[in-house]
From Swiss-Prot:
NCBIfam families, per database record: hutI (TIGR01224)
Enzyme class: hydrolase
Keywords: Cytoplasm, Histidine metabolism, Hydrolase, Iron, Metal-binding, Zinc
GO cellular component: cytoplasm
Function as written in the Swiss-Prot or TrEMBL entry: Catalyzes the hydrolytic cleavage of the carbon-nitrogen bond in imidazolone-5-propanoate to yield N-formimidoyl-L-glutamate. It is the third step in the universal histidine degradation pathway.
Gene Ontology MF terms: imidazolonepropionase activity; iron ion binding; zinc ion binding
Name of the protein this chain belongs to: Imidazolonepropionase
Annotated pathway: Amino-acid degradation; L-histidine degradation into L-glutamate; N-formimidoyl-L-glutamate from L-histidine: step 3/3
Gene name of this polypeptide: hutI
Length: 417
């Protein structure tokens, strides 16, 4: 996309007709032979085409050619901005090395830290843009992007600045998350408490004051940070009025999900080792469970998240790519829907909610994204499908016809432009 192509993308204003509408993930609320009106970049009306108010019958028309229109998709957990890649570690995994073994050998997160620190902002932007474009082409209109590969103030700032720049350049809603407590940088080896002090008292205050942070995250694991260290990060976030989320219970059960719930976290993510007490705490707090089937698949995990318990307690389940260079180098949210159904046994409506309303809730943005509703910014996707179930059914195929982001039309294979 050229620098001015966002402004040159045509307006979505007018009546979208010859379509079927899925306002949210509930198939009972689907509207066949529907119409949707966009005015000044926002949804002004939606319903059955036969009920279109007279006031809009003379408005410009957009023929959807029988497509289904859904809310724009939301990718609520990504590590999209980083330097380099880690294909060499893939070979190590195939030879039997595990996540912890690679990390302790100096690979993993810290190897990406070296590449990220060594890259300038323009290089990081170009690399991240290439990763973002396939997601845009699949109908993603809102995305979370974490830092966590800088692990010092300068490089964390660089990552977050690139994330903001991606949103401005592509006309997509980007929600930034400060993940300074992702791993120990080499210069703080064996000094985790000192590093957490830097995160809480230097990095977070500076980045929050610069308006670069929407939420705060941490990696609470035996190879990451302890419950006590994570709580210090959460307390610092609260002092700056920032919501929190947590990488929790991926490799073991440290009680991270319960900690997240005590702090009314937006989400707890991964959760392969989550127990019933953690599920109950999340339910009481309204914390979203973000499922990351790409990492589960890539790591060849065998411990499933407790889907039945999450259902039983009414915990909202979101689905995300977890795009990152080490454990989920995937750029397809549609594939994650299929994996969530096939690997985790989610239903199709659960998968649809997982990439729309529940994903938006995991960002604290369910008042802006995840549903087609009057008054909201026009973020939606048109699909060449006979039924919304096909979005979770196909894999390796992108049935998108048109994507509307922030009231602008991005068509067909050029939906990422």
């Amino acid at each position: 996309m050229t620098p001015n192509s966002l402004l040159s993308a045509p307006s979505a204003d007018g009546v979208w007709h010859h379509c079927h509408l899925l306002p949210d993930a509930d198939p009972a609320r689907a509207i066949r032979d529907g119409a949707l009106v966009v005015e000044h970049g926002r949804i002004a009306w939606l319903g059955a085409a036969a009920d279109l108010p007279e006031a809009w019958r003379g408005a410009p028309r957009h023929d959807a050619n029988g497509a289904w229109i859904t809310p724009g998709l939301v990718d609520c957990h990504t590590h999209l901005v980083y330097g380099g890649q880690r294909a060499d570690e893939f070979a190590m995994r195939l030879a039997g090395a595990g996540y912890e073994e690679i990390a302790r050998a100096g690979g993993g997160i810290v190897s990406t830290v070296r590449a990220t620190r060594g890259a300038d902002e323009d290089t990081l932007f170009a690399q991240a843009a290439a990763r973002l474009q396939p997601l845009l082409a699949e109908g993603v209109t809102a995305i979370e992007i974490k830092s966590g590969y800088g692990l010092n103030l300068e490089s964390e700032r660089k990552q977050l600045r690139v994330a903001r720049r991606l949103g401005e350049h592509f006309g997509i809603s980007v929600y930034t998350t400060f993940l300074g407590a992702h791993a120990l940088p080499p210069e703080y080896a064996d000094r985790a408490d000192d590093y957490i002090e830097l995160v809480c008292n230097t990095m977070l205050p500076a980045l929050a004051d610069e308006g670069l942070v929407d939420a705060v995250d941490a990696f609470c694991e035996s190879i990451g940070f302890s419950i006590a260290q994570t709580e210090r990060v959460f307390d610092a976030a609260a002092r700056h009025g920032l919501r929190v989320k947590l990488h929790a219970e991926q490799l073991s059960n440290l009680g991270g999900a319960a900690l997240a719930a005590r702090h009314r976290a937006l989400s707890a993510d991964h959760l392969e080792h989550l127990d019933e007490a953690g599920v109950a705490a999340m339910a009481e707090a309204g914390t979203v469970a973000v499922l990351l089937p790409g990492a589960y698949y890539f790591l060849r995990d065998t411990n499933l998240p407790p889907i039945a318990l999450l259902r039983q307690y009414g915990v909202p389940m979101a689905i995300s790519t977890d795009h990152n260079p080490g454990t989920s180098p995937v750029t397809s949210l549609l594939l994650m829907m299929n994996m969530a159904c096939t690997l985790f046994r989610l239903t199709v409506p659960e998968a649809l909610a997982g990439v729309t309303a529940h994903a938006a809730r995991a960002l604290g943005a369910d008042d802006r994204h995840g549903r087609l509703a009057v008054g909201r910014v026009a973020d939606f996707a048109l699909w060449r499908i006979d039924s919304p179930a096909e979005l979770a059914y196909w894999f390796g195929r992108n049935p998108v016809a048109t994507v509307v982001r922030q009231g602008r039309v991005h068509a067909g294979a050029g939906a990422a432009a």
